[in-house]
Swiss-Prot record:
InterPro entries: GDT1-like
Name listed for the protein in its UniProt record: GDT1-like protein 4
Organism: Arabidopsis thaliana (Mouse-ear cress)
Signal peptide: none
One GO MF term attached to the UniProt entry: metal ion transmembrane transporter activity
Keywords from the named record: Membrane, Transmembrane, Transmembrane helix
Membrane topology: Multi-pass membrane protein
Family according to the record: Belongs to the GDT1 family.
Compartment(s): Membrane
A Gene Ontology cellular-component term: endoplasmic reticulum
Transmembrane portions of the chain: 12-32, 39-59, 71-91, 135-155, 175-195, 207-227
Amino acid sequence: MSSVLQGFTKSLAMTFVSEIGDKTFFAAAILAMRYPRRLVLAGCLSALIVMTILSATLGWAAPNLISRKWTHHITTLLFFGFGLWSLWDGFKEGGGGSEELAEVEAELDADLKANGKSPKDSSKREDENKKQNRAFLTQFFSPIFLKAFSINFFGEWGDKSQLATIGLAADENPFGVVLGGVVAQFLCTTAAVIGGKSLASQISERIVALSGGMLFIIFGIQSYLTSVEA
């Protein structure tokens, strides 16, 4: 088992480059323009923290189900696979434009029309709920909070970053992995919520993909060169 610091550092770097231009990053930026920022930030962060803890728990449990030697080899292959995947995406990208930002915005607009709600309608409904009994709970678990939570939680489910977190927690100290992941999620999500669409549109998906690919390859090489007890 590696040190907490090593798990923290690798998780922080991996999560940051995976999330800074991810779909959930763009979703947080767009939602923050339409709804109260504190509710969007709370919902997005809650979902990402829960997902990080779940992923790290799965990774921690993996060596107890199969041998640590096999989990180490699987993790190494995951790093190389995700590295090549990210590099391919990076080389395939055109310029610095954000096509994914436009896709996420279109999906959110479609969802908004399907529900027949506008941000103002949601705010009015929230104000009415506050006047009812259990005002504290309805304020905390507001429709906006739940919307931000669900979009980010299901957006991360089965994503490359989730699988990488599982693999990293199987090979590194799980506490360090969770801590590094949470710090990175906080930094990325806060930047998205504060910066909004203007910041998101300035991010080059190509540079992010190439940086993430190189980082995954480095992790793969380091994992390959690291001996592990059976």
